[in-house]
Every structure is written in structure tokens, then in C-alpha cells.
Amino acid sequence: MKMKRRIAITLLCFACIMLLLLGRLAQIQLIATESFTKRHINLIEKSVTQRTQAFTLDDGRGHFVDRNGENLGEERYPVLVIFPFLQIKNDMLEKITHIIGVPGQDIKLQMKDKRKPFILQRGDKPFQLTKEQMEKVNRADILGMVAIEVKMKQISEAEHLIGVVGENEKELKKRYEKLKKLSSQTIIGISGLQQSFDEFLMTDGETKVLYQVDRQGEPIFGKRAKYTSPGNPFYPVTIQTTIEKSLQQKAEELVRTHGIKKGGLVLLDVKKSEIVAMVSKPSLQMNDKRAYQKTMENQMLTPHFPGSVFKTVIAAAAIDNDMIQSHRMFNCNTDPYGENFSQVMMGELNFTESFARSCNRTFAVLGDELMQKDKHIMETYLEALGASETVGWKGQMFHTSGFKQLIEEKKATVWNGEENKVGHKAIAQTAIGQKDVRISPLAIANMMATIARNGEKREVKAVKEIRYKNGTKFFYFEDHKLEGRQLSYSTVKQVQSLLRKVITMEKGTGATFQSLPLSVAGKSGTAQTGKEDRVNRWFAGYFPYENPRYALVVVDLETNSKENTVTPIFKEFVEEIAHLEGRR
């Protein structure tokens, strides 16, 4: 009796175990095939992947182009993709050698010890095929070799502005918690426009070339490779930026060759209020996390000490408040406080001469007089010149009311505390762009563009529009005006004249620009940084003076070099623009 009971219990246990195993098998094979375990593993995909050898041609993420439709940050290269696990015979190698002109031994060497598909290289770069070579390779129907265009990343123009992408599972979940089917390896935008426009750029699926193989690694469906893609006519999208690639490349070349370690330049289209070129140094370092964190900041969107460029704000305020008399002279032999001799003895100068030669004492005196009238006057006129708040395009974009194109941009600072507004020395330092004053190069460029437009303030665009894959328009960014006070026409005209005198006066700080093919108006600046002997050197201006088309800011930040790199960069860039315009 006991024996029968034991047998029954044993059989029951076996039956339960079998039921559990069958249940688990049913879960794997029938129920949870597309979302297995807490990690939501797609078992069907994994099964296909196991017997598939694939090479990704396009990750499916949206891409950026310049204002003329030229690619930024990536190119499509016609290359030879080799699947080394497939047995490529010698006669096939001879055939491919004859078509592309690469010795068979070189190809064999690259195939050695490789199991995954790869692109044939020449040195450290992909071997690029001609259109004719591509057609011949594919007509030859060689097992394991495919000639095709592949989307490849390259050193990006405007790398800080465009931004970088990467894997970040925590950030992915935070941004897209409702999209449960996203893989934890999904690429997202980490910085720049890649981050701002991430939800529009997200991949809808990869485009691949592949072979499906049996357990011996032999192709199941013959010699021809197969192609897979999402087949969506609308995605991925194209983001058309306002950048002009040729000018961007020239800007990067100038900043690099003149050795700016920290700083860069911003070029704006005055009439359209668009970024034409933007360079930030130091360059992005993607080698390791620490190096990236040190170089990730876009210096053109970050506020810095503006030095004497800020005198433009004081000048506008003084003119607008009828404080300028042509006969009034200022003692420019003293320091800003009127206590000691100045490092540069300029003698007695009137207001116009003081601006052209950048006399600190004049603007310290005017700043003090302005503050006696109104404790908020400096902030008021910085706003009137379009430089106090963030100046990048922002507004309604579909369901997002506060969408910002330039997500990393920071607004200007004039005062860190109200107590400084009553101290004469603090006021003097502030009036010459020191103390707590910080303004980004982009905001200063927008100030120059505002002056060039006779006081009309606008937000600055980095992106014109988004287009679907089929070329139709998805979203267009309309021009936006900056709200708030504007300078009177009369005041702006006088400020324009002052900026021009910086160049035309014999001893003006911009006199070296007199010989340029396009007439320039602008203001130089040198700011103490509080870091030993390091200074910020600036030149901000617009051109041509008679019919302004561009506003340009060049800045060398925290430099201890005796050599002024800002002036030659500004000069050579204006010459390049004049040359390009002459060819159009």
C-alpha cells in the first residue's frame, strides 16, 4: 500500500514538473514571444539574429543638413562590405581585385581572424568605390561581398552646436517612459541640437544588409544578400539647419590655425537672424568620460566677462538719456576710479574718442551717472539691445509650448546683488564689463545684429525646418521677435556711428580693419578673468556697414598669450566672406 502511494506521489510530482515545463515552453513559444522576462526580450528577434549575419547601413536616426542641403556630421560612402565567415573562393577574389584594383592578398589580410562583416579599408579610412565599380561588383554576384552606400559618422562641422548621441538607459526611460518597446540600447541625443530635437530624430528601425545562414554558417537563400529597412516614407526626418557648411569649415580652420584653446566665434545672418557659423573650443573629446565632460560645454552659449564690449550698452543708455555733450571732455589718463594713473595714457578725450579708443574712465563716470538716474538702467539697456535673456528660438512646437532650439544657452548677468549698485567702484567695474557682468558670445552677436537692424530685436534660429523622408515639410520655424523695450531709431543711428568710428578713427581699437573689402563697425574688448594673468579678448561687429548682412563675434577666452589672435581671425573671416560673395 505504502509503495503504491509513493509511486502515485512520485508520478504526481513528475506530472507537476512536466506541466510547469510545458507552461514555461508555452510562455516562451506562444505567449511571451515579443516581451520575455522583465527585460522585455523579443525572442523572435533573438532567434532570427542568431541565424543572421547582418551589417548596419543606416541606424535610422534623423540627420542634419546645412542651409543648402549638404550633410553635417555624416556622409554616405560607397564601400565594399565583406562577410568573412562565408567562404570566398580565390577566383572570386581575383574577380573583385580586377574590378576595384585592390590586391587579393590585401583583402585576405583584412579578412583574417574576422567573423563579423566589415568595410574594406585603405589605411585607416574606408576604401571608396566609384559608381561604376559598385555596379560591376554587384553584377558579379560574389558570395559574401556587397557594394553599397553606408551612412558613416565623421568629424562634425559645428560639433558643439549639432551635439553628440549615445546610449543612456536612465535618461531614455526618463524622456520616453511611455514608449515601453524601446530597446535599452536605443541611441539618444546627449547634447546640442541632437538633444533638443531628439524626439523627432529617434530611429524607426535600422537599414541592414544580411545573410541568413544555417548551423554550418552557409547561406540559406543563395548568394544574394538581402536588405531590410522599416520602409516608412516619413521617417527618418531631416533637420535643415541655418549653418552654411563652407563658411563653417573656414571658421573652424581659422580658429584651429590661430591656436585658440578656449573660445571661438559666432557668425549671424543679420537679415534672417540665423546662425551661419559657430565654433567652440576646446573641441569635443570623446575618448573617455572625464575628457568629454571637460570639453562638452558650448562656449558660444555660455556667459563670459565681456570687458569693453559692454561699453556699447553704456553708450546706448547715455545717448538715449541725453547725457552726451560734444564739448564734454574726460580725463583718460586715470584708472576707472579716477584715483591712479591709467596703464595707457590717452589724455583728454570726448565721448566719441573715448568709445573708439576704449577709455575706461569715461564709461565708469557715465555708468555712475546713469545709476543715479535708475538702479536698473544697465539691465534695461542690455535688454533693449537684445542680449539680456536667452536669445535662441523658443516657442510652441506641436504639443510642446516651451520648446527651445538652443537648450544649453544661458542668459546674461549684470549684477549678482543689489548691494553692488550703490558702490562707486562696483559700478565702475560693471560699466566696463567686469565685476559680475557675464554675456554669451551668441547674445553679443545678437546685440550687434540688433544694432545693425536699426534696433529691431529678434530671436536667433539654428534650425530652419524639419522635413519628412519624402521631402515634404514637417515643421517650419517662423521668425520670432524678442519682446520688451527697443531703442529709438535716433539712438541706434548714433550707436552705429560710434561702432564705425572704432574702425575709421586713426587710433581706434579696430583701425586695422580699415583695409578690409567689406566695411566693418564694431567694438573690441579685453576683460580680466580673475585667473592670474588670463584675459578674455573680444571683437564684436557687423558688416558691411552701409547694408549689414552679417554680425560676427570672435573671442579668445582665459588666454595668457601676448599675441592677439582675435583680430587676425576676424579679419581673415571677413575677407573669406567677401571672396565667397564675389564668386556668387
Say what each PLM segment does.
Residues 1-287, 379-384, 557-584:
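Periplasmic/cell-envelope proteins involved in peptidoglycan metabolism and beta-lactam response
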Residues 60, 269-299, 307, 316, ...:
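Beta-lactam-recognizing serine transpeptidase/beta-lactamase-like catalytic domain environment
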Residues 231-237, 293-300:
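Bateman (tandem CBS) regulatory domains
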Residues 303:
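Extracytoplasmic Gram-positive cell-surface binding/anchoring modules and repeats
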